[in-house]
Regions:
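Positively charged n-region of N-terminal signal peptides that target proteins for export
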Residues: 1-7, 115-117
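Short regulatory "switch" loops immediately downstream of catalytic or recognition motifs
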Residues: 2-3, 17, 214-217
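Bacterial N-terminal signal peptides
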Residues: 9-20
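Signal peptide processing junction and immediate N-terminal pro/mature segment
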Residues: 22-24
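Subset of outer-membrane beta-barrel
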Residues: 26-321
């Protein structure tokens, strides 16, 4: 019974978010944010030495019946002819047992500018087609409840449209040297309208800042490194700060993060020249910890053969997760 009430409360909250999305709207997030670089910052398009395919899966709060499931796939490559990179990102976010579904298809372009022999800057631009749909058959409201028979009444909550779509734009910048890197990105520059109810409901801009370093460790520095990182994101009334560190020893990668006020994140991964796989688990520390059961995240990357290259370009040295 308690689980049923919890499901009802979550589904009802999902709808209230739809009704007041200007105040509550928030993009899905990944704990392994460097494992989904194009989603983090469009300037990452084409930053790898060779073409790559990346896939990501996140199951957030599975204790509430798979309430948030996000999947993504991307491809990006550097092209000498344009002195930059191109990327494609497809993302699907499923909320509230399929009550709300969001699908994004994004194209990215980045341009690389070498400031000197040690430092480069990349500028990125992104265009996105977004589609959102709501499954009204699975929505549950307080006025639908009969004390004896359960959810049998019709609701008076108004829903004008069951789907909406729009175009969006984002931009980012990335600076990097051999050991250090930083980036800034702004998503939803146009703040597109996304309401299902015919009332003003713009999607708030998302601001991202990230900075880190990859530093050698030990006598044989080529075998082991550690990477401290900071991530800050703000979107509407939401903001969070991630503080963490990665450690690499041969193909093994370990990571530990703290999302301030929300969770601790542990990661284990394997990385080779052709393949990368990582698993992370969020230990929720907020008030949802007893019911949410944390979050699971899986990432995978496949490096494709490098095309013949006439011009050398600098690649960024940053964590893969």
């Amino acid at each position: 019974m308690r689980k049923t009430l919890l499901r009802f409360a979550f589904i009802y909250l999902t709808f209230k978010i739809l009704m007041n999305s200007a105040a509550y709207a928030q993009d899905p997030g990944f704990s392994q944010f460097y494992a989904n670089p194009l989603y983090l910052n469009p300037a990452f398009a084409g930053t790898a030495k060779c073409p790559r395919i990346l896939m990501n899966y996140r199951n957030q709060w599975p204790g509430i019946d798979n309430s948030f499931i996000t999947t993504s796939a991307s491809y990006d490559q550097h092209f000498d002819a344009i002195n930059g990179g191109l990327g494609l990102l497809i993302l699907n976010d499923r909320t509230g047992e399929g009550v709300l579904n969001t699908t994004n298809v994004s194209l990215m372009y980045s341009y690389q500018l070498e400031i000197n022999r040690r430092f480069s800057i990349k500028f990125g631009a992104q265009g996105t087609y977004m589609q959102r749909s709501v499954d009204t058959d699975n929505l549950r409201f307080g006025d639908m409840i009969d004390p004896r028979r359960g959810f049998v009444n019709l609701t008076n909550e108004p829903i004008i449209s069951e789907s909406t779509s729009y175009f969006d734009a984002s931009a980012g910048i990335l600076g990097f040297s051999e050991k250090f890197y930083f980036g800034l990105a702004v998503h939803h520059l146009t703040e597109p309208e996304e309401s299902f109810l015919g009332r003003p409901s713009p999607l708030p801009r998302k601001y991202t800042a990230h900075i880190g370093a990859v530093l050698p460790f030990g006598i044989r520095a080529e075998d082991m490194s550690w990477s401290p990182n900071i991530l800050f994101q703000q979107q509407g009334n939401f903001q969070h700060i991630n503080l963490g560190v990665y450690a690499n020893k041969g193909p093994l990668v370990l990571g530990l993060w703290h999302r301030i006020g929300d969770s601790f994140i542990g990661l284990v991964g394997i990385e080779t020249d052709q393949f990368k796989f990582g698993y992370s688990y969020d230990i929720t520390t907020s008030t949802l910890s007893n019911k949410a059961a944390g979050s699971h995240e899986i990432s995978m990357r496949i490096n494709l053969p490098c095309p013949p290259r006439k011009v050398k370009f600098k690649t960024i040295s940053c964590p893969s997760f």
